[in-house]
């Protein structure tokens, strides 16, 4: 189980490396040290009723429209993200629902447009910040509380 957890933690890190990069080093990322509580069902976009023998753990792409007032990392209750994420889920992940139990957490995201102004080295250093930890915490919570040793697929955009 530990090897499987370690392997999939690495896979999630790679997915996040491509999807969510950068945080302004001159400013602290908001919510940096506050973990999202994934025992709260409102912090999940999708928690299915188990009907299938396999699960999908899905991470949607950046789904918020940052404003200057938002900062570099959105909050877990960001209205823009919570409005867009279900639509993106319907377009990208609902196709799995006929064959799998699809789990999708809400997670804080970095401002993707600002990330373009950073060097790759800076981006790599910043990847392990808030969004990575939210996704990893959600994945670990899923494994410990929802998965029940079913096989699973990691899906993301």
Spans of features found by a protein language model:
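N-terminal extension/subdomain marker
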Residues: 26-86
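Conserved alpha/beta-hydrolase "nucleophile elbow" surrounding the catalytic nucleophile
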Residues: 156-157
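Hydrophobic membrane-insertion alpha-helices, especially the h-region
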Residues: 13-17
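C-terminal motif of bacterial Sec signal peptides marking the signal peptidase cleavage site
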Residues: 19-22
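Bacterial N-terminal signal peptides that target proteins for export
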Residues: 2-10
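Active-site catalytic motif of lipid deacylating hydrolases and related acyltransferases
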Residues: 61-152
């Amino acid at each position: 189980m530990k090897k499987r957890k370690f392997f999939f933690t690495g896979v999630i890190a790679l997915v996040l490396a491509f999807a969510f990069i950068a945080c302004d080093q001159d400013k602290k990322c908001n919510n940096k040290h506050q973990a999202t509580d994934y025992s709260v069902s409102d912090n999940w976009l999708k928690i299915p009723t188990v009907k299938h023998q396999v699960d999908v753990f899905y991470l949607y792409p950046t789904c918020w429209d940052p404003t200057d007032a938002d900062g570099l990392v959105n909050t877990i209750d960001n209205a823009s993200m919570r409005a867009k994420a279900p639509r993106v889920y319907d377009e990208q992940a609902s196709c799995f629902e006929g064959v799998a139990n699809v789990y999708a957490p809400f997670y804080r995201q970095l401002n993707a447009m600002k990330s373009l102004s950073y060097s790759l080295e800076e981006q790599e250093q910043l990847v392990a910040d808030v969004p990575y930890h939210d996704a990893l915490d959600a994945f670990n919570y899923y494994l410990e509380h929802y998965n029940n040793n079913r096989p699973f697929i990691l899906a993301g955009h």
